[in-house]
Design a protein with these regions (language model features):
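Conserved Radical SAM active-site core
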Residues: 1-100, 109, 138-146
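Radical SAM enzyme [4Fe-4S]-AdoMet core and its adjacent flexible, acidic
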Residues: 5-14, 21, 25, 98-100, ...
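Glycine-rich loops and low-complexity Gly/Arg-rich segments
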Residues: 68-72, 104, 127-130
Length: 177
């Protein structure tokens, strides 16, 4: 993501936490009073930012409020810092909001073994595992509980400096599912 920011000259780096012009798009309305984002839309949240950052505490409650308000949409975000989720959830989260999908990223076996046990224990209704950037073969069989994991996706890196992602690794994940 940051390579693309650099390529397009946005000057946004991993250390900057900011709200962009589309920050409140999920709750914006058209002139006729309808939602700008129609019902049934999957809202991919914070794909170039990080909802669970400590310095996002000032605006994170707004995001949870929109999620409650727009139960007619799906909100999807993923993180490599799943250990921060519990302290960032809203008080009324319970077992998770029905319209939120949370993905946990893993790029190698070490990260999978560290993140996925916690991910499976957290109160989340809709879970997905994202093997990205897939940097090595993974054995995820012990984590792929079909009662808890709804989806597994895999991808490599892009750009000139991308490290290899081997087809055999992706095929192995499919077979594990």
């Amino acid at each position: 993501v940051y390579r693309q920011d650099e390529m397009y000259g946005t000057g946004v780096g991993a250390s900057l936490c900011r709200r962009n012009e589309a920050f409140d798009l999920p709750i914006r309305k058209r002139r006729d009073g309808g939602w700008k984002i129609p019902a049934g839309t999957v809202v991919f949240t914070c794909f170039t930012s990080y909802l669970l950052r400590k310095d996002a505490e000032g605006w994170r409650p707004e995001c949870w409020e929109w999620t409650r308000r727009r139960r007619d949409c799906w909100f999807y975000f993923f993180t490599k810092r799943i250990d921060r989720l519990a302290e960032c959830l809203p008080p009324d989260w319970g077992e998770g909001y029905e319209n939120v999908i949370i993905g946990c990223t893993v790029e190698n076996q070490d990260r999978a073994d560290a993140r996925l046990p916690l991910f499976l224990e957290l109160p989340i209704r809709h879970r997905t595992v994202i093997a990205a950037p897939l940097l090595t073969a993974l054995d995820l069989r012990e984590y792929l509980d079909p009662e808890k994991i709804e989806e597994l996706t895999a991808s490599g890196e892009s750009g000139r400096e991308a490290r290899p992602c081997h087809y055999e690794w992706v095929l192995s994940l499919r077979e594990q599912c």
